[in-house]
């Protein structure tokens, strides 16, 4: 991590020096039950839309006792009828984790057929998802479900925290010590004493609250090809569909010149690396950055300003009219 100064300047002129912070790892508690041996049973019940949880006994039968995830074909079993998923069969070196007998290559076709007859709620039903799916279609939906938790947008580490937006905002503030601002305009300054040395991890993050939403402003320096570049971009703390309701602009300049960028913030559903690697933001090459810095061009002094606004659709003209008021 670079040790040079990275400063966040709020609209009111207060300066905050932000460096790399340590982080803590957390996990949500789970109340999952571990499945046992497969039972010889015919299951005909379908979980209806008013149910609050899957049929427990059936769900347990389809839960791998090793990884506790739902099992999908091929489902394996030992001679005593204990089942596990194909991934865990390799992990346990072909030995049943329940009775220690050799697994062989026996498939539990009966349990696979039972699964075909089931309809189950999305696993995010307790977060508000009302959808019911055939067992083998459920996994695909859950990977894209709008009610699934968001991943922590902090870019300086592999943080595994997930949760809803209010939880993540508190997590960023309290655990990652991220700078928080209210308002839709920003004024940031990035200062580096030796602009010829750049680590890929040199970056800063600020969270803005406006229009009742939260936005993450990223500013980073990283190596691209033979030289360093500096990039700024905005991410929306919510889904992509809602992100399209907002726009933002970024501007960097100096010595009578300026470079501007305007775009739509990306949802934090897209990973930080995905956004960065797509070049979807304001990108400043080192020579241009030094030109904007002025002076003898031996020290980098970049000031990035910008604003966020909400697009308002005009029913008469069909055009989008920017709303610059953050209240």
UniProtKB/Swiss-Prot annotation:
Record flagged with keyword ATP-binding: no
Polar residues composition-biased segments: 8-27
Zinc finger extent (SIAH-type): 117-177
Main location: other
Localisation: Endosome, Multivesicular body; Cytoplasmic vesicle, Autophagosome
Assembly information from the UniProt record: Interacts with SINAT6. Interacts with WAV3. Interacts with FREE1. Interacts with ELC/VPS23A.
Name this polypeptide is given: E3 ubiquitin-protein ligase SINAT4
Source organism (scientific name): Arabidopsis thaliana
């Amino acid at each position: 991590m670079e040790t040079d100064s990275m400063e966040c300047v709020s609209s009111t002129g207060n300066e905050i020096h932000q460096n790399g912070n340590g982080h803590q790892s957390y996990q949500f508690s789970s109340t999952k039950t571990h499945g046992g041996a497969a039972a010889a049973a015919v299951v005909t019940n379908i979980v209806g839309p008013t149910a609050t949880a899957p049929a427990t006994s059936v769900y347990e039968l389809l839960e791998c006792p090793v990884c506790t995830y739902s099992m999908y074909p091929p489902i394996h079993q030992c001679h005593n009828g204990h089942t596990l998923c194909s991934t865990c069969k390799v992990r346990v070196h072909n030995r049943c984790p329940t009775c220690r007998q050799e697994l062989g290559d026996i498939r539990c076709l009966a349990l696979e057929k039972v699964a075909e007859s089931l309809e189950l709620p999305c696993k995010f039903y307790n977060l508000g998802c009302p959808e019911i799916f055939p067992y083998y279609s459920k996994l695909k939906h859950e990977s894209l479900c709008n009610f699934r938790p968001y991943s922590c947008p902090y870019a300086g580490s592999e943080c595994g925290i997930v949760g809803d937006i209010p939880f993540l905002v508190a997590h960023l503030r309290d655990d990652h010590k991220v700078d928080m601002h209210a308002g839709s305009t920003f004024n940031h300054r990035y200062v580096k004493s030796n602009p010829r040395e750049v680590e890929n991890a040199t970056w800063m993050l600020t969270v803005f609250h406006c229009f009742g939403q939260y936005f993450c402003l990223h500013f980073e320096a990283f190596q691209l090809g033979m030289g360093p570049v500096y990039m700024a971009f905005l991410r929306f703390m919510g889904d992509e569909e809602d992100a399209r309701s907002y726009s933002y602009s970024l501007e960097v300049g100096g010595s009578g010149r300026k470079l501007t960028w305007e775009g739509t913030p990306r949802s934090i559903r897209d990973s930080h690396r995905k956004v960065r690697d797509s070049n979807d933001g304001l990108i400043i090459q080192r020579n241009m950055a030094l030109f904007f810095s002025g002076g003898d061009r031996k020290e980098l002094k970049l000031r990035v300003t910008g604003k966020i606004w909400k697009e308002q659709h005009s029913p008469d003209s069909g055009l989008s009219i920017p709303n610059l008021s953050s209240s």
